[in-house]
Amino acid sequence: MNITQLQILAAVVETGNFSAAALQLDLSQSAVSRAIAALEDELGVVLLSRGRFGARPTRVGERVLQLAQRMLQLHDSIVHEVNLEKGLQGGHLRIASFRSAATHVLPPRLALFRQRCPGVSVSIIETDPQGVEQALREGKVDIGLLPLPRSEEFDTWEITRDEYVVLLPSTAHPLGQPLTWAQLSRYEFILYNYAECTTAVRQHWATARQELKVAYEIKEDSTIVSMVAQGLGAAILPRLAAVPIPPEVAAHSLPIPLERVIGAAILASALQVPSVFAFLDVLRQTAPEVRATG
């Protein structure tokens, strides 16, 4: 028996079903089911009655839940006391991030950080990667989320990888059928005029020895997606910059894959407060893959 199993039991009873508990705890439904099954196996009793109307505690489950809630309260008290010692109560964490990471990468990690360190307030600045670097240099933020690699003045950690995809009108090419460079060279492209992305796409395209026909250069990713939907051209964007992708647009893999690495950075020469290391622990312990569908 462990704290996580007790937290899951309490969440299932509170929400009334496994799927809602999974959503509340940011877990998969199968992980919730496995945790409850393991707890029941260990105790040798059925704690929850499952049915069409959800999950409800059995008679023994109600008694176990009362004790579990007391244990969870004691656990929270222990965490609170330890955080007081670490300086994580009443602290403040300042984060800078570029837009797609702030939208898709940061929220689940912030949610976990808030669970672990509820006494730390967080502020977020959204800017481009160069702006993230400058904010770190000037001491305006503690941690930055930005594409890697960066210069040696920063200590960095990889968080996830983001595939560049070809965006075409949904009727232009069958989904799942590979694209060739020769096929792509027939399209006019709406180029993503944004920091390192432009350079990465141009350099990658150059390896194909095909002409890149640029019809527009646009900085706003959502504008590019809308233009592709209207048949004004094709585009190559990091997937996280492209989502949500409307039905009129289809995302295809490049003939040769291209990824960007998204990571966290701190200024190597700066003295860091405890909340920075606590957040870095969350980043390191979080699964390294971010999936964005659409």
Curated annotation (Swiss-Prot):
Entry GO terms, CC: cytosol
Keywords: DNA-binding, Transcription, Transcription regulation
SUPFAM superfamilies to which the protein is assigned, alphabetical: Periplasmic binding protein-like II, Winged helix' DNA-binding domain
Keyword Cell cycle: no
Presence of the UniProt keyword Transcription in the record: yes
Segment forming the signal sequence: none
Coiled coil location: none
A Pfam family: HTH_1
Domain HTH lysR-type: 1-58
InterPro entries, sorted: HTH-type_LysR_regulators, LysR_subst-bd, Tscrpt_reg_HTH_LysR, WH-like_DNA-bd_sf, WH_DNA-bd_sf
GO molecular function: DNA binding; DNA-binding transcription factor activity
Superkingdom, taxonomy of origin: Bacteria
DNA-binding region of this protein: 18-37
PANTHER family (UniProt xref): HTH-TYPE TRANSCRIPTIONAL REGULATOR YBHD (PTHR30419)
Family the UniProt entry places it in: Belongs to the LysR transcriptional regulatory family.
Protein name listed in UniProt: Probable HTH-type transcriptional regulator LrrA
Annotated source species: Synechococcus elongatus (strain ATCC 33912 / PCC 7942 / FACHB-805)
Gene name of the record: lrrA
